[in-house]
């Protein structure tokens, strides 16, 4: 379980904006920003905050979370339940939410889910014809396997036909990794050649690519060069040497 903090829906994950018939000052905060369950801890607790001044109703939905071709895939599940499924928060109010595991953890690999918190439309106000933003926030739920859970990363770099540089990451471990950012430097250089912001998750057994466009003022190194990669992740800082292939 990582650091506890509050995220605002306006800056958080999976923000959904929908137009209806009223202006709202409500927004959603959640603490902590993820839940980690296991055979020893089958229930996790989250606190949902209404950081605005207007009352708001929230509906919870848990989805199985997988990835395919670098994209998130969500499917319905009953393996994790969130309770209460629907609740109303006054302005400035909070609600304790519990996420409970309803199956045995996998013996070898981490299981991954997401809890979606959807703000529900309020009763219509016939006296106002403005717009309302409905917040939708998503946060991850990780279920640890019986074995030790650890991401194992393989980085690759290749020049593309248009001169860009494609950085590829494959996670061959049995647990996720979240890449917060990474930088690439030439050996002996005091300054990074480029820094890439990310915040991307790569689940176990999955891959992700980043394409860094060609820049005449700062062109990618040629094939055969070795880049020094430094990444900040939710598992700590990591370094790797990456060979650029044609």
Regions found by a protein language model. Give the residues of each.
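Bacterial N-terminal signal peptides that target proteins for export
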Residues: 1-11
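Bacterial N-terminal signal peptides
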Residues: 10-19
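Beta-sheet-dominated interaction scaffolds and their linkers
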Residues: 25-51, 147-164, 199
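Asparagine-centered strand-capping/turn motif at beta-strand->loop junctions
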Residues: 48-52, 168-173
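Short, hydrophobic/aromatic beta-strand segments
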Residues: 54-62, 176-183
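Intrinsically disordered, low-complexity Pro/Gly/Ser/Thr-rich segments with frequent PxxP/GP/PP motifs
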Residues: 72-73, 77-105, 191-219
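Terminal connector regions
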Residues: 103-144, 148, 217-246
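Structured core of small recognition/catalytic domains
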Residues: 180-246
